[in-house]
């Protein structure tokens, strides 16, 4: 009886550890109404909550080499993650496409100025409550905010002159910021992470909502389970994931 219980527990823990280390690349499609009958396409690679994980060659091989933009949805790192690990991860992601990054609630534990220097070294852009045009897609802009834990979220600044774009990708680490934005602006695509999908779920039940992608009349919203873990390197019912969103417009 004891041996059976022990074997069962160890099997579950092994399953949870394996789930946390998976390199799942989840693919989504978003069709945006266009007078030109969808003659343009943009591919967005989105990854959030990397924490202590490596962006390695095995993951890179799974990602389409024609992605147009890489968006890191916060929690690139946390306390105890080496600067060399952070630098390597950004270097590897920057081989795919231009990198845009938003702060998560744990990132500054690894050193704010150090992260800024790494981003600058690889030509990556930090979205500090601001917006920029997306290279190769001049009618599209990307906007992002700081993390709410800093009390420096400025949605108004992040959307300043936003009407210069026909379409906007809006990213913030925490989903609650997306809900605030929706009260007075409707981006074409919204992205967030932070929740880890609850990380450990029993059936439908978890401490936080499981990640999902929703579309509605040419607009999309993605809340990711995230790629890494916090506290314990285990997952159940909310597997590690990153995303490629193919937008036809």
Model-predicted segments: where are they?
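Active-site metal-binding loops of divalent metal-dependent hydrolases
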Residues: 48-52, 69, 74-76, 105-106, ...
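Conserved beta-sheet core of the metallophosphoesterase superfamily
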Residues: 175-249
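Membrane-embedded segments
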Residues: 40-127
């Amino acid at each position: 009886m004891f041996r059976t219980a022990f074997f069962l527990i160890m099997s579950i823990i092994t399953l949870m550890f394996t789930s946390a280390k998976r390199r799942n690349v989840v693919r989504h499609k978003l069709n945006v109404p266009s007078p030109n009958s969808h003659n343009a396409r943009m591919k967005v690679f989105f990854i959030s909550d990397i924490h202590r994980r490596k962006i390695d060659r095995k993951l890179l091989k799974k990602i389409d080499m024609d992605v147009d933009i890489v968006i890191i949805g916060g929690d690139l790192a946390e306390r105890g993650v080496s600067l060399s690990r952070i630098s390597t991860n950004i270097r590897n992601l920057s081989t795919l496409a231009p990198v845009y990054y938003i702060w998560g609630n744990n990132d500054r534990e690894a050193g704010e100025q150090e992260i800024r220097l790494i981003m600058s070294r690889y030509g990556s852009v930090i979205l500090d409550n601001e917006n920029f045009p997306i290279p190769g897609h001049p009618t599209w802009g990307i906007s992002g905010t700081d993390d709410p834990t800093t009390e420096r979220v400025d949605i108004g600044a992040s959307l300043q002159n936003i009407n210069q774009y026909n379409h906007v990708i809006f990213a913030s680490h925490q989903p609650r910021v997306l809900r605030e934005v929706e009260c007075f602006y409707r981006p074409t695509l919204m992205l967030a992470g932070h929740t880890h999908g609850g990380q450990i779920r029993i059936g439908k039940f978890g401490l936080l909502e499981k990640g999902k992608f929703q579309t509605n009349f040419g607009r999309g919203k993605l809340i990711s389970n995230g790629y890494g873990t916090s506290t314990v390197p285990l997952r159940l019912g909310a597997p590690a994931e990153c995303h490629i969103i193919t937008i036809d417009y």
